[in-house]
From Swiss-Prot:
Protein name: Pre-rRNA-processing protein IPI1
Sorted UniProt keywords: Nucleus, Ribosome biogenesis, rRNA processing
GO molecular function: chromatin binding
Subcellular location: Nucleus
Domain of life (superkingdom): Eukaryota
Organism whose genome encodes this protein: Saccharomyces cerevisiae (strain ATCC 204508 / S288c) (Baker's yeast)
Entry's Gene Ontology BP terms: maturation of LSU-rRNA from tricistronic rRNA transcript (SSU-rRNA, 5.8S rRNA, LSU-rRNA); pre-replicative complex assembly involved in nuclear cell cycle DNA replication; regulation of DNA-templated DNA replication initiation; ribosomal large subunit assembly; rRNA processing
């Protein structure tokens, strides 16, 4: 009996039932009833955005794989700077956006430059607080394997010097000079010239002009005080540089004893001479103008004067920038 009943049930699955007039079609046994009405649907771990203007959730988009998303995110933050300049969002914003100095897209890098200009025009002190991170990634860009990233590195340096030049030259005077020499292809003291970029006439003159202008600004901030930059009076500068200032005055900048490195740990450089890095210069504190000028005269000035003479003879925009740099060097060191 049981076997015959199962056979009948199996046969019913393959039989087409006759529809009767006036009666609806029967529903399947596994049909789901969707006729219920609910006022709310609760989904775990999913919440509606209560504040559509909250920019903290956009920070992760700065690491998005799409170039347009990164660019649009930088533009959004740039437009929002006036309203968030005094908020706690600035620190994570700069921490997430500064690595874009080495971004593969030129549009993203230009968007970051515009963002830095917008922040600096509202409050330059914020850029000064993140000066170390800026210098770190600028140095990385100067030695980057991609030529375009390397060429744009001095753009970031020029814009950073415009808002916090004194902070930059005090902390990384020698490193930045070595980096600018590298992108110009001039070779540095203690290094092989073939290791740097070879300077040829085929190189884009536009980028050479940008590099020379960045070097001009770096030397201007590193070897001149604020009064000399504004007035252009060299006599007062040389007179004041030799006088002993009151050591008990409140310093003009934060962390005046940072160069002593009392609470920092540094990695030991093994065989620094063989690697081509002058460890003495890199560890030298360049807090004052006199020290920076002495380092520049001893290590960099002869090379700069030799190279700019060649560029001046070639003429063009590069020649103008080189002549401008030559005038500055004569004003400071002659």
């Amino acid at each position: 009996m049981t076997k015959s009943r199962k056979q009948k049930q199996k046969k019913q699955d393959f039989l087409r039932k006759k529809l009767k007039v006036g009666k609806p079609k029967e529903k399947a046994r596994n049909a789901t009833d969707t006729s219920f009405v609910s006022k709310t649907i609760s989904i775990r771990n999913q919440h509606l955005d209560q504040n559509p203007h909250d920019l903290t959730k956009r920070l992760t988009l700065l690491k998005h794989h799409n170039i347009n998303v990164r660019k649009e995110t930088l533009t959004t933050f740039q437009k929002s700077i006036p309203s968030i300049i005094k908020s706690r969002l600035m620190t994570p914003l700069l921490t997430q956006s500064i690595p874009l100095i080495c971004d593969e897209s030129q549009q993203v890098r230009q968007g970051l430059i515009d963002l830095v200009d917008e922040i600096g025009s509202h409050d330059a002190e914020i850029l000064k607080l993140h000066c170390n991170i800026f210098v770190l990634y600028i140095n990385m860009a100067m030695t980057h394997i991609v030529t375009q990233i390397q060429a744009d590195s001095t753009k970031f340096l020029s814009h950073l010097l415009k808002y916090c030049g004194d902070e930059v030259v005090r902390k990384s005077w020698v490193k930045l000079l070595n980096g600018v020499f590298g992108v110009l292809g001039w070779g540095q003291v203690g290094k092989n010239d073939s290791a740097s970029i070879v300077q040829t006439k085929k190189r884009n003159a536009k980028y050479v002009t940008i590099h020379l202008n960045a070097l001009y600004t770096l030397v201007e901030y590193g070897c001149q005080d604020e009064r000399a930059r504004s007035d252009g009076d060299t006599a007062e500068t040389t007179e004041d540089s030799g006088t002993l200032r009151n050591p008990y005055l409140i310093p003009d900048y934060p962390q005046p004893f940072e160069h002593l490195k009392l609470f920092t740990r540094e990695l030991k450089v093994q065989d620094a001479t063989s690697s081509g890095v002058n460890a003495t210069l890199l560890s030298l504190a360049t807090q004052d103008i006199d020290t920076r000028k002495a380092v520049f005269i001893e290590q960099f000035l002869p090379i700069v004067r030799k190279k700019i003479e060649v560029i001046i003879k070639e003429g063009g925009e590069c020649g103008k920038s080189a002549n401008k740099l030559k005038t500055l060097l004569a004003k400071i060191f002659d």
